[in-house]
Amino acid sequence: MDTSVPVISSDYIQSARTEYKLTNDESPITLQFPSTLERTRVRIMGKCMKVDHVVIEYRNQVPFNAQGSVIVTIRDTRLSDEQQDQAQFTFPIGCNVDLHYFSASYFSIDDNVPWQLLYKVEDSNVKNGVTFAQIKAKLKLSAAKHSTDIRFKQPTIKILSKDYGPDCVDFWSVGKPKPIRRLIQNEPGTDYDTGPKYRPITVQPGETWATKSTIGRSTSMRYTSPKQIDIDDSSSKQYASEAEFPLRGLHQLPEASLDPGDSVSQTQSMTKKDIESIIEQTVNKCLIAHRGSSHKDL
């Protein structure tokens, strides 16, 4: 059952079509959001919000022979500065287009609206400060009781000028990072080198502890190795096996090689007289060796 309900019916919240001046620095595009009254209603209902769809209508106001590229960026200010970009569009300055971006995240109504639209122009023969286009942004929001997984839908560009084609435009959207499991670290107050707290190994019938253990692996999966090993599949599997399971072949060794010898309870205990005899013999050997080396020096 879909828990989303439209905030403003099924209509888009539209900003006024506004003229923008050409600049080489990123400048904001006006994006209209719900009124304070509407946001208060959603807050009272205890719901969160989601940006369903953003449409940016670009209409140029430049001469026939104008050159340059317009770059429109959509950002989410909740992330760190270097990772805020969510999508980016590029198109010729003389091309009329509609840019479509479909959201992939929710946000709290108690926070400031995290979305920003920015534009800039590069490699243009149009002077800075000249009004070069009209831009209108339309926004569609929805409210939900709680967040759910959102199916990714790629952004699109609708070209309205006949003199331009798909090879004149480009767009990009951010990818989802690969999930990495982070192992639990040592308890507070313990040394890092003492090793992690491993869970007991479950040995099933027909298995050995050596084949199931992973002694020798890194104590943390926080970082991935920057080096790539260029070997074939068979060698790669063997390498990974030896690295992750260094004791896999321990059970195949003969029992004699694994026998540490008699235990303390099985060996004959030494008396004080035996220990004194060993010390006396050792001292005598050291004295004899020292005297021999002294004669050689003379």
Swiss-Prot record:
Compartment(s): Host cell membrane; Host microsome membrane; Host endoplasmic reticulum membrane
Taxonomic superkingdom: Viruses
Predominant location category: host cell
GO biological process: transport of virus in host, cell to cell
Annotated keywords: DNA-binding, Host cell membrane, Host endoplasmic reticulum, Host membrane, Host microsome, Membrane, Phosphoprotein, Transport, Viral movement protein
GO cellular component, one term: host cell plasma membrane
Membrane-protein topology: Peripheral membrane protein
Protein function: Transports viral genome to neighboring plant cells directly through plasmosdesmata, without any budding. The movement protein allows efficient cell to cell propagation, by bypassing the host cell wall barrier. Begomovirus genome is shuttled out of nucleus by Nuclear shuttle protein (NSP) and the movement protein transports the DNA-NSP complex to cell plasmodesmata and facilitates further movement across the cell wall.
Subunit structure and binding partners: Binds to dimeric supercoiled plasmid DNA.
Family named by the database record: Belongs to the begomovirus movement protein BC1 family.
Name this protein carries in UniProt: Movement protein BC1
